[in-house]
Regions:
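A polyanion-binding, active-site-adjacent surface
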Residues: 1-178, 186-193, 225
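Short, flexible loop segments at boundaries between secondary-structure elements
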Residues: 194-227
Length: 227
């Protein structure tokens, strides 16, 4: 896991935020926020050394990994404020989760629709969440320069290719894990790497229903990830 974590430090230049090594001065609760995000990602990964599935989406978003440090995972989930949906922080990792955003921004923590849909789908299917690693083709947070850190930007094709070394390190960490592509950007990266993977509809922008159906169909074939 050391090689994987080390590669995350090498984020590209431009309108890209690195949550594990950069501080968001206007929105982070403390100077130690990047270290907290690194610790939370490390805890998440350490509990998934035997994962059998990598669910690969597009890029980190400001409502998810920007503050949690974990792909497709929101602070609101980590803080236990999604229990009414059957989702709790113990699904993510066993330790005590911490917020890194200023409480005044979102008292309950930022929440990301895609994150809630993905974790909800795993919950509904009875999936052992330690068997699934959530990750992104472009592992950092691309934002719109005119709108700042609290915005999302679709990474360009060349940017997405920069995520290949990180993804290869992740695949080496959980060798044998099956990769599922969520959206066109992740499918394109996998194709460039010569990897054939099932392609799922991204749950954003009206795609939640199709994503749930496709995800359920694929995961039910791999029964060992189900409880």
């Amino acid at each position: 896991m050391h090689a994987f974590m080390k590669l995350l430090k090498n984020s590209p230049a431009g309108p890209v935020f690195n949550p594990w090594h950069d501080r968001d001065p206007g929105h982070d609760a403390s100077p130690g926020a990047p270290a907290v995000r690194r610790e939370q990602l490390a805890s998440y990964m350490a509990e998934r050394q035997k994962a059998t599935v990598i669910l690969l989406a597009e890029a980190l978003g400001y409502q998810g990994g920007h503050f949690s440090g974990i792909a497709m995972t929101s602070e609101r989930l980590l803080l236990g404020h999604l229990r009414h949906k059957g989702l709790g922080p113990e699904m993510v990792f066993a330790g005590q989760a911490r917020r890194t955003s200023l409480e005044d921004l979102r008292p309950g923590g930022f929440t990301e629709p895609t994150a809630t849909i993905v974790w909800g789908a795993m919950h509904e299917l009875g999936i052992d969440t330690r068997q699934v690693i959530l990750w992104n083709a472009f592992p950092w947070h691309p934002y719109k320069p005119d709108k700042g850190y609290l915005s999302n930007r679709t990474p360009g094709d060349e940017e997405v290719l920069l995520g290949e070394p990180v993804l290869r390190a992740l695949m080496a960490y959980v060798s044998g894990a099956r990769v599922l592509a969520v959206g066109q950007k992740s499918a394109a990266l996998l194709a460039a790497m010569g990897i054939t993977a099932p392609a799922l509809r991204h749950p954003a922008n009206g795609g939640a229903g199709m994503f749930r159906a496709q995800f359920a169909q694929i995961m039910k074939k791999g029964r060992k990830v189900l409880r």
